[in-house]
């Protein structure tokens, strides 16, 4: 079935690690990586009902689809994938405001839509691993790699199928700049997330929601 493939990768991470080694801040760097990766996964899974395929170092590969067991709603899938991509960036900005020494990091995001088989390998249960491989996943990764320090880029199939409101945010080559959740939500005239279940707080949720994220709690 067709679905949306999302790659989100930290840019400048190698330089960040080199600097952390020089300054003796390895523990802070390891903490930052784990917090940011957990935040990415929580946005994908808890906020948007998507699935993480895997982490590749400081990069997450995720999948999203809207519809039923018979067919995928392409327009809804693309809209929600765009919101998810924006929410990942918004939550990344929240992480940057709470963690030490990560202000120079950027985030490159690539999104594409198309047929993608999904399976699992390994021992059934916690020891199994989700796998997904297709032209769509390859293109979404290529879109991510073509981004500069803080950009989001959509693939050609997204450009063909995206609603007009979303296309207004995207250039002819798929670039969408520093795209965040509020940008997409406003463009498609969708209400912002009204409620977020505790203990998670989201940068893309209404400001009235208290920041109760345990791993971002200020001391």
Each model region followed by its residue ranges:
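Intrinsically disordered, glycine/charged-rich C-terminal tails and inter-domain linkers
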Residues: 125-131, 139, 148-219
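Catalytic NTP-binding/metal-coordinating core of nucleotidyl cyclase/transferase enzymes
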Residues: 1-80
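Catalytic core of nucleotidyl cyclases, primarily class III adenylyl/guanylyl cyclases
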Residues: 44-76, 95-133
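Alpha-helical oligomerization segments
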Residues: 142-143
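Polar, enzyme-active/binding microenvironments
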Residues: 92
